[in-house]
Amino acid sequence: MILLPCGILKNREFCTFEKMSTLLKRARETLTIEIAGLEELRERLDHEFEQAVNLLYDCQGKVILAGMGKSGLIAQKIAATLTSTGTPALFLHAGESSHGDLGIITSQDAVITFSYSGETDEVLQMIGHINALGVPMIAITGNPDSALAKASTVHLSVAVDKEACPLGLAPTASSTATLALGDALAMCLLEKRQFSEDDFALFHPGGIWDAS
């Protein structure tokens, strides 16, 4: 039997081809589940997505993206993508928002809130302030019946049939779908703004990129 080293393990254990096959099976199943989630998302896109793009395009200020936990991390990446492709955006940590950081939102801005359950307390606590400013809010959740979805100007669903996590607990397929939806918003805005390669270069003076 051929043995493959697995790294530093107790009692110098080794991985057999059978064990490696199990690992590959899990990896492929993970990707299959996440691909299925993306396909669901693609087929679900409708006029609400177009409404969200137009809302962000018409924004006279900046786009504020807010979330907690894994949703917050995804929101940070989407904020960076928007900013680098012609749509000024900032991430607002929902947990810090009620301790003074709500001041970053102005009446000229638009807000995108992220919560897969749509019931994250720290995110829901922001709604009163957002409404008081009359700021439009796009909610990205996995539950159209959630409090966050119902309070939004536009709701975009990232619901998935199941997570890739075998425990059904860790955000995997849902976080991938959320990230992809953010990319879709950013690329539609890029195209709508006629954002060019020269514009991209202007925003990336310290980077190495290939425009060929």
Language-model-detected regions and their locations in the chain:
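An N-terminal, well-structured beta->alpha segment
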Residues: M20-G61
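Serine-centered coil/turn micro-motif
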Residues: S21, S146, G207-I208
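Short, basic/glycine-rich phosphate-binding loops at helix/coil junctions
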Residues: R28-I33, I78, L82, S212
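Glycine-rich phosphate-binding loops that contact phosphosugars or nucleotide phosphates
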Residues: G61-L190
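Internal, active-site/partner-interface "lid" segment
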Residues: K150, A164, E191-S212
